[in-house]
Amino acid sequence: MKIAEIKELATKELQERLDAEVAAYDQMRINHAVSPLDSPAKLKHQRRMIAQMKTVLRQRELNK
């Protein structure tokens, strides 16, 4: 998901997607600890996605 797509989402929908991404990231970390992932770069991508979502939410909060 690109930053432009993230900005188009409604705040409530963005928060729901963020919660889902955080849960998926936690699950990926657990799975990676047990047996290595095919591509550890997926963890980096997931962290970046979460950071972008949090950034957009914070920008909206400050602009109110």
From Swiss-Prot:
Tagged with keyword Ribonucleoprotein: yes
Keyword Nucleotide-binding: no
Entry GO CC: ribonucleoprotein complex; ribosome
InterPro entries cross-referenced by the UniProt entry: Ribosomal_uL29, Ribosomal_uL29_sf
An example molecular function term from Gene Ontology annotations: structural constituent of ribosome
Pfam family, one: Ribosomal_L29
NCBIfam families: L29 (TIGR00012)
Protein name: Large ribosomal subunit protein uL29
Species per Swiss-Prot/TrEMBL record: Porphyromonas gingivalis (strain ATCC BAA-308 / W83)
Gene: rpmC
